[in-house]
Amino acid sequence: MGWFTGIACLFWGVLLTARANYANGKNNVPRLKLSYKEMLESNNVITFNGLANSSSYHTFLLDEERSRLYVGAKDHIFSFNLVNIKDFQKIVWPVSYTRRDECKWAGKDILKECANFIKVLEAYNQTHLYACGTGAFHPICTYIEVGHHPEDNIFKLQDSHFENGRGKSPYDPKLLTASLLIDGELYSGTAADFMGRDFAIFRTLGHHHPIRTEQHDSRWLNDPRFISAHLIPESDNPEDDKVYFFFRENAIDGEHSGKATHARIGQICKNDFGGHRSLVNKWTTFLKARLICSVPGPNGIDTHFDELQDVFLMNSKDPKNPIVYGVFTTSSNIFKGSAVCMYSMSDVRRVFLGPYAHRDGPNYQWVPYQGRVPYPRPGTCPSKTFGGFDSTKDLPDDVITFARSHPAMYNPVFPINNRPIMIKTDVNYQFTQIVVDRVDAEDGQYDVMFIGTDVGTVLKVVSVPKETWHDLEEILLEEMTVFREPTTISAMELSTKQQQLYIGSTAGVAQLPLHRCDIYGKACAECCLARDPYCAWDGSSCSRYFPTAKRRTRRQDIRNGDPLTHCSDLQHHDNHHGPSLEERIIYGVENSSTFLECSPKSQRALVYWQFQRRNEDRKEEIRMGDHIIRTEQGLLLRSLQKKDSGNYLCHAVEHGFMQTLLKVTLEVIDTEHLEELLHKDDDGDGSKIKEMSSSMTPSQKVWYRDFMQLINHPNLNTMDEFCEQVWKRDRKQRRQRPGHSQGSSNKWKHMQESKKGRNRRTHEFERAPRSV
């Protein structure tokens, strides 16, 4: 099948898809969409594509002081330079052959499970890290020396000191783990058995006896999947500090009709050492509450996003009240969506001070507890702030008994403004990770979210107030593909010092800058329309915004994105012959079809077309119909007529600002003139055309005939029939082709001659019809 006919058939399929999708709105799309190739060509991504004998780059630890990113993977621990991850050190930490064979004999996959997958990577002190891995279903931990100072350049495993990793790392590499190391003590949420059924929140290491949640009690934990753990002060007294765990779990019996997943936040006191007679070596201050992330639906039925995927804490001036960002997805296999919800710690504390969930038996519903709550209130840390108890071992028996039977709160925690700040339901991906950066802009502070997806893309989103700062709308600035192949993003870290973002997946690690101001354009209006808090117009280019720069030359409007007000160069916006205007000349054949391509850089811009007849100054808006069809890629003109000759102006309209992107001059050649040029047997150019046609190979003549047939049959409704005829003829020719019966020597000679022929060929007659 010829080149042109193949392209024509492909174009027909793309055209139908484009026509169907054009009616969709542009409000929920990224303003800029950058492919992996575009990211590479613009030097906006650096990738570490992994090692042949490693994978699963899921466990991140950021060290801004040393300018290193530590990454735990399969059988390896890496130390990447934050400036450029191409510069790295590695530690090889595999399991022994004996452990691997035991894992294999237990029925596990020798490649995907019988290895040492690093699950815990925490800073132990100023000179060492603490690392734990699955150890081929035999968890193991050790220390890694990193030196006192960054210039020490030390990164080595202490292979003389290994510890049992039970209660620190899961056995199964597929299970999630949340860990936090404080004052030499490791807090971890994980599974503590080979079968992956005994889930618990542990505290190990240190000088105290290990402590955990109650075992085999679904009221405490019901098949949880741990996401993250964070230390948050409760007051100015360090004795009141609490560790909060974020996880998702199956709903408790009676809490929901049918099987459901709930997102949770759990709390424990840092100075909890268990009970004296009851709950010995068990948490006595553990409480949990449900996190709600939902949107109102018809008939009062809300759509819930219950699958908690990731959590990020944005610190504020008050360390006791960080903002909690959570990424959620739906549990349904039919309706797939993602959401980001934002929570305040004051709302969390209010719920933990509210009523406890209670029911009298298995056949009863959960209700708020109405009886007397013992003193001190269960969940309160023993300190001088809230009572005279020095230790949880001194708590009265009724407090311990109540805490054991009432670990859940009745009221849930609702997000700020009672709704998500971002929802995505009409895309082929789901959110997996989130990090947030607080950026100072000309008109205030903005939180910029970087959201990872399960297809290897990163979304850059900024929340902008509509009327007040309490009523926010999200603006999707960019969608960036950061890996060559689609892969789930499983880890993200943000370096404010380096202004870089680091992304982990099964395939490798990627690094990209937080801002790419130069890609927005070379005009003030384009920079202003981007609404990127990192960027501002400095008088000559779109560059990084610095609050300390001279205010006189800066142009930035994140809240409204209004270039008409802020840019002084807009007096030239109606000059169609400006330096940024692209001009093209296209030739079309009468009664055939042609396509005028025009795609603005911004996917949020609306395209507006005008037509200017030859030798006329007046421009008129192009009206769509059967003759002219608009797609997202441009204009399709069917059955060209001589009157279609003229200038076509493509404008992009965004936020009330119109910019001319392209001027296309269309010249329509009448059919009689073309036939005369192509088939004329007279001397001159006609003889040259005839000579060219006679010198064509049979396959080239078929291609030429297909082209003429397309010209003489411009009705695109028969395009699929035409393509089917070409494909049938091509298959028939392949079936009728004689078999090759030559010997190996003749075959080799034929290949050599063919190769020489290809090298001498100029390809002059294989060009597309337009170039001919």
From Swiss-Prot:
Q: Which PROSITE patterns match?
A: IG_LIKE, SEMA
Q: Which Gene3D superfamilies match?
A: Immunoglobulins, ligand-binding face of the semaphorins, domain 2, YVTN repeat-like/Quinoprotein amine dehydrogenase
* Keyword hit for Metal-binding: no
SUPFAM superfamilies according to UniProt: Immunoglobulin, Plexin repeat, Sema domain
| Cysteines paired by S-S bonds | C103-C114, C132-C141, C269-C381, C293-C341, C517-C535, C650-C723
**Glycosylated residues, chain numbering:** N53, N125, N591
Basic residues biased stretches: 729-738
Give compartment(s).
Secreted
Query: Keywords assigned by UniProt?
Result: Developmental protein, Differentiation, Disulfide bond, Glycoprotein, Immunoglobulin domain, Neurogenesis, Secreted, Signal
- What residue range is the signal peptide? 1-20
Xref: InterPro entries = Ig-like_dom, Ig-like_dom_sf, Ig-like_fold, Ig_sub, IL-1RAcP-like_ig, PSI, Sema3A_sema, Semap_dom
Q: Where is the Ig-like C2-type domain?
A: 579-665
PANTHER family assigned to the protein according to its UniProt record, in alphabetical order: SEMAPHORIN, SEMAPHORIN-3A
Q: What is known of its domains?
A: Strong binding to neuropilin is mediated by the carboxy third of the protein.
Its family? Belongs to the semaphorin family.
Q: What is this protein called?
A: Semaphorin-3A
| Organism classification | Eukaryota, Metazoa, Chordata, Craniata, Vertebrata
Encoded by which gene?
Answer: Sema3a
